[in-house]
Amino acid sequence: MCIRDRLDPTGLFTSRHAEPVPGTCVTVTLEGRRPLLAEIQALVSAGRENDYGNARRVVSGLDSARTSMTLAVLELRANVRVGGRDVYAATVGGMKMTEPAADLALALAVASAAKGLALPADLVAIGEVGLAGEIRKVSGVNRRLQEAYRLGFKRALVPTGSDTKIDGMEIVEVSRLDAALKRVKITGE
């Protein structure tokens, strides 16, 4: 028995569905200098009227404080109702992600789950979400998108000012979370 190098570890951290599924979004994280695609999955329970109990927030593989902040920004800045609803968020394959560049993908996955609308299967999302609902620049956007394109992704949402062009890839720059949701046709109530 021998140990072999895995040339493309992305398959460990993403899953391919026959049809797009609500509540999933792919991002590109950096492990050192190496870009890795990772899928974030979210599940949002149906709202309950007159439920005075605390909503559950269950997080696996993501920073729970960043997740809580992103949920608050979704509610208050992008009008996606998650208060009073249980929210579950996880990374595929047990990957641990703490970098802010995954915020936008998390927000899109949760909004997609809350609305029951799937995101395009060939979309990646990269960007930090600020408390005012702004999408902030992150490092290594060009390297991240080159890897996503190499693995078959044709569309990307990135922060305004990223100034990245890749032939064959539609790259949309967004400055605000509500604008990002509109670009993927998931809007608040």
PLM region spans:
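Peripheral, non-AAA+ core regions of ATP-driven protein-machinery
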Residues: R4-E189
